[in-house]
Amino acid sequence: MHPVRKKRLLVITAIVLILSAAVGLVMYALQQNINLFFSPSQIAMGEAPLNVIIRAGGMVVKGSVKRNSDTLAVAFDVTDFQYKVTIEYRGILPDLFREGQGIVAQGKLNNDGVFEATEVLAKHDEKYMPPEITEALKNAQRSTGESAESVQSTY
């Protein structure tokens, strides 16, 4: 092989190896920062992984909020109008957290099917709905045949 071609082949091989390593490192870093969203229906059907950081959300079921008077622990149910999931959280809830409102929580689903949240986010006004919750509510509406308003009034 001609020395110039050999040198060119080595340079191209080195560039390909460096780019492959860079892409691999970026993919590894991004994999650890991806938090997938699961609706209460998906969680109830076993689609959500256990003990992995995920996001879950829905509408807070009216009358489901239970606070511990001695600690900052709170438990409440969220629904997509098909299934309910219990969320446990230790901390101060957002000011906009209310029963009947949409929330998104980040945390882990334990072996008992209870979502242990490390962060709870509430919607910021009466018109905003997180896209994940909007999609979950539309899917629930399609499968039950009821309007979201009529189902929401029961919760």
Swiss-Prot record:
Q: Which residues lie on this side of the membrane: Periplasmic?
A: 30-155
GO MF annotations for this entry? Answer: heme binding; metal ion binding
Transmembrane domains' residue ranges: 9-29
The disulfide bonds in this chain are: none
Supply the alphabetized keyword list: Cell inner membrane, Cell membrane, Cytochrome c-type biogenesis, Heme, Iron, Membrane, Metal-binding, Signal-anchor, Transmembrane, Transmembrane helix
Q: Which GO terms describe its cellular component?
A: plasma membrane
Q: Which GO terms describe its biological process?
A: cytochrome complex assembly
Q: What is this protein called?
A: Cytochrome c-type biogenesis protein CcmE
UniProt organism field: Marinomonas sp. (strain MWYL1)
What gene name is listed for this protein?
Answer: ccmE
